[in-house]
Amino acid sequence: MRLRVLWVGKSREEWVKQALADYATRIRRYAPLELVEVRDEKGAMAEEMRRRECERLEKQIPPGATLLLLDERGEQMDSPGLAAYIGKQRDSGTADLVLVIGGAYGFSDAFRRRGRLLSLSPMTFTHQMVRVFLLEQLYRSFTILNNEPYHH
């Protein structure tokens, strides 16, 4: 199963770039992984920004991919739950699992209906932090699936 993580906007902070690179290297021991940044929209009304950003995200999704969208209104799961979800996708023959982090105003309603919604926490985090948290949880999921001693 191939993993693709999409997000809106550039990773600007050097520590974020380093953390993303570190977790990407770790994850690639278990599965092919691609990280894709799409340009954020500026100077438009919120709904128009969502629409344009989601159009850009849409172009990065392989046909037939399974989508997991990070959304504050999404389902919350613990780390073993996320690992179980990823394992189920892998074991059921999912070719492409795409995880998507939206822009500052989230996803359009139409885009939100395309995938399963996941919330990392009831708290609000910066988009930069969420990228790191998501990759860490992906890595943790693979260590759980492989019975490795990272998750206690």
Curated annotation (Swiss-Prot):
Asked whether the UniProt record includes Cytoplasm among its keywords, one would answer yes
Give me the residues that bind S-adenosyl-L-methionine, please.
70, 102, 120-125
Q: Which SUPFAM superfamilies match?
A: alpha/beta knot
Spell out the InterPro entries in the cross-references.
Alpha/beta_knot_MTases, RlmH-like, tRNA_m1G_MTases_N
Q: Which UniProt keywords apply?
A: Cytoplasm, Methyltransferase, rRNA processing, S-adenosyl-L-methionine, Transferase
Q: What class of enzyme is it?
A: transferase
Catalytic activity, as annotated: pseudouridine(1915) in 23S rRNA + S-adenosyl-L-methionine = N(3)-methylpseudouridine(1915) in 23S rRNA + S-adenosyl-L-homocysteine + H(+)
Q: Does the keyword Chloroplast apply?
A: no
Which domain of life does this protein belong to? Bacteria
**Which Gene3D superfamilies does the entry link to?**
3.40.1280.10
The GO molecular function terms of this record are: rRNA (pseudouridine-N3-)-methyltransferase activity
Cellular component GO terms, alphabetically? cytoplasm
Which Enzyme Commission numbers does its entry carry?
A: 2.1.1.177
Cellular location of this protein?
A: Cytoplasm
Primary localisation category:
cytoplasm
State the family it belongs to. Belongs to the RNA methyltransferase RlmH family.
Q: Which PANTHER family does UniProt cross-reference here?
A: METHYLTRANSFERASE, RIBOSOMAL RNA LARGE SUBUNIT METHYLTRANSFERASE H
Function text: Specifically methylates the pseudouridine at position 1915 (m3Psi1915) in 23S rRNA.
Q: How does it assemble?
A: Homodimer.
Protein name as annotated? Ribosomal RNA large subunit methyltransferase H
- What species is given as this protein's source? Pelobacter propionicus (strain DSM 2379 / NBRC 103807 / OttBd1)
Its gene?
Answer: rlmH
